[in-house]
């Protein structure tokens, strides 16, 4: 990513104003509006109930719902001459040209109708008089109903225009992500040749998308079908991709300043964002081979169709960036640090704990960005290999995809009536326990020191003090949960988590900043450099002595942003600078930082997901999924084909896009073969976990690199070049040898041993 502070004049100033202020402010307003939409129904229901309690009068039968609008005087005539009105109506009936066809009413029928109308009119006047008296007796009702109806108007507008809000958010976020070179790729561009290849690829990709959006608009326009509000969405797509094309064209002509010299043409292709590859691939196929240029634009419509899901994803991303502004992760690690655990054991505990925030941030990889750097630093400083620490960082954002309230499972349940969220979350716990246990077993197998722990007499008091320090944050969580539960009659679940988590984290950030909390405590240094206990692969594990633990050296990986460079890690003993910087950041500055980061991640992730759906659409139109055999008699063979297909799909597609494709194509075929729906989706979900950490996409590895920094990852790779194959590529191999056996166990064991009553 480029440093926005490098150039604050001319176009650089305009870019800075757009990315740091205009788009940040607009997206913040849209996120807050999304929060209002999400909580609007529950809040409005409470406002109506409160209005009834305050202004309702059971004695007179007056309800607040009658008074939400100013009472209007009835237009009917209150006092009439009944006989005269009856004669007038009889004459009018006689003059009716259809009277002979329907028959003429008798005088008694006409009189009854007139009397009934007079009674209704009198009741209207009585209600009007009673309502006016009630309003005059409660003058504050006008102010209250103005507030209540105004809130309802905002809520109603937002609910009816979710798709429009999402597309506007994506427009601002995607432009900012492009200006900041924030799109997700295998590595960031850094050399002159990197930027040249990057810019040309982005130009071609965005040009395809712009042309496809225009083709779709023209197709709908020529069809004569009324577009309604979709007209604005079509225009926004065309504006977005036209703007991105112009930005890419400018970057081709005037390339960003390289951050280092050298580079090669082949390696430069690693700098091209994944969404650009997807856009070019689908654009070429749809336009030139299928004569379907509007294909990409049509599949972008999936974002509109599932606008609620993607708005929730945006809220989860915001929650993750707010988490990054808190000390929660570091304070949790403070509880573990005194025990000086072996890196493998420490990592296992971190992964267990990380699964919950991963699920509560939508399983979108946002937790890796929010906490990846501190997890990496903690595992490495505990004595773990840097490659092992990188693997742990990537896996910290994948194990939670099967836990409540993961957004991915909500998408699965919404597209497949055969399963429910409760069923998937229930069996997801078994998947989580299996995969996390396998991680512990396999990582201990490759560990240099199998076991290490500090003396409980030393560690327990320190750990207890660290737990006491985190109690206020637990109290904040409980108070907000109780407020939603009892004040708004809403519990925390997979449907309300996207709305509640940003509110909880906003309060935690505010709490941190009001208390002027110091910087996070530094991580424990390498054990073998500081402690007297001799711990190596041949020794018997020992407890650390009190003196050794007391004299342990504490280090903080000082991450400094240097102009034009990625995050550089200096493992010197430096702590004061970070502390002072964190103390100077107030609440509003933290809000600005978190929202600005949210903008970039929304732009990068949502566009990637949209193009992933487009790739799924291409595969669907190529009828690749229809190649799945339909005459197989062996269930084991069917399961094997599903496993292979899920691994393939997980490797090349974002899970949110893959769910849409699989639900429409593979799932119905699997059900026909007798594969239990829950079993099928457990295989699919563990396949997505594997896909998160498996090349060529390996999204969590890319996000971990983004969090930790290219320079640090390069150093980690460089220091193991002389070692064996496994240790050279441990960050790629370890997640695979953990999750692949887990997937095979989940795929075959329930069928072979007839578990859970899924198979007769």
List each model region and its residues.
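Alpha-helical transmembrane segments of multi-pass membrane transport proteins
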Residues: 2-760
